[in-house]
Amino acid sequence: YSTAPLDTFRNLLEQQLALLGIPVTVMAVEELWQEEETLSERLAAENLQEDLEKDPVLLYGKLFSGSYEDLWDLKKLAAAKAALASFREAGSGVLILWGYGALCDTLRPLCDQKIYLDTTPMRAMLRLKRGEYRNIGTKKALAFKRMARRCYYVDFEVAAKLRFTLLHEKQLDSYVIANDALSMSLLPASLLEGIFARAMEYPLRCKPVYLEGVWGGYYIQRLRGLPREMKNCAWVFDMIPMEVSVVFELNGRKLEFPFYTLVQSQGPKLMGKRSVDAFGYYFPVRFNYDDTYHSNGNMSIQCHPGEKYVTENNGELGRQDESYYIVETGQGARTYLGFQKDADVEEFIAEARRSEKDGQPVDYQKYVYSIESKPGTQVMIPAGTIHASGQNQLILEIGSLTVGSYTYKMYDYVRKDLDGNPRPIHTYHGDQVLDRSRTADWVDQNLVNGGRRTLRKGKGRICGGRA
């Protein structure tokens, strides 16, 4: 998987073979990439467009629809295939074919032992931040945000597709847990499958990921005893499929796997046939906590895209709908949802754009409706609805579109992030998807506690021997 420490593993393998007196030949697939300039121009045109008016901080793009082979020079790929075939015929010792994509459909049939190195999403992001990874086809590490964007839309996409093929078609001989380059664990592929199959016999919970944020609070930090060094805790990713991992204990040893590796291996057992038939091996729900308890402000005023917009522009599977379940509140907590009854929505958008340029605040409460937050309240947030979690509460956020995150911030109170940089605003995209018709009365009738609708009714019944 992308960012896994392949060079470290290859060095260890070479050393062990040398100790046994076995000759080693090494072939790196990174030599097969298309020329950097050619590949970068192609991706910029098709997947990573740079339009600073629409996307000021270059956050979004379109998922790459191909495979590793589609990023390689076909002549170089053919030459590599011929070289592998020749070595199998007349070579001596061991040839190590290594690199991201080495087990692609074209080259895999020529390999006698197929080993896959995997790593958790958190470890992958830490390696990106430390500059320990180069994007596909690049000679040096890009700036972190550019590297992360290219990873999401290209590198991670082709890596996940290949991992699915290898797991689903049982193509692996060995699987390496490569979260820590200094302490890797190699498992026979049959053992990996056995661990995952056994896990399906029990309830399981993912290992959470905790992130600081400019609006972060302190409820979860205190409740779960998080490190005091954390400035706060804004997001608690209990089940964001592309962010979390699972830990299983085997003979006293804890083994940590990416949750999505489990999904790709055990999809029907984990999600059920109906879900797989509808969504494929895509985990169709996510949930996380947003903590503004005793924080210094609200979440940003934001909205999310519907199906047509996000599929056409980003290549994603579907719309981003959400709901908030209010878990705990402090004094004055409110949840922002929809527009005020007589709000001038076009004026709000103009004010948001003006604020984005001149850095002056907007009277957002003049335009955005809010309700008093009470524990136990649930609000639905269909795509296109303006919304925000207000200060001083803990909410459980349940949503769809579980891999990407398309949050179009319309207004963020002229705040800077924890690094001192202005937070990104996406008024262009927000304007395109915003549903202007969702005002106070409609919100109260349809989105708060299910609109207080009666789904079914009948005569009461006492079950069991005692009331």
Regions flagged by a language model, labelled:
Residues I22-V94:
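ATP-dependent small-molecule kinase phosphotransfer cores
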Residues L6-G21, M122, R130-Y133, Y153-Y218:
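NTP-dependent small-molecule kinase module
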Residues A78-T138:
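ATP-dependent NMP and nucleoside kinases share a basic, alpha-helical "lid"
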Residues Y1-T8, W33, Y100-C104, T385-H387:
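Gly/Ser/Thr-rich loops at beta-strand to alpha-helix junctions
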Residues L172-E346, D412-C463, A467:
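Transition-metal
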Residues E328-P382:
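Intrinsically disordered, low-complexity linker/loop segments enriched in Gly/Pro
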Residues I301-H304, E372-Q391, I398-S400:
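Conserved metal-binding segment of the jelly-roll/cupin
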Residues M299, E322-S323, Q391-D412:
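A short hydrophobic beta-strand segment most commonly corresponding to one strand
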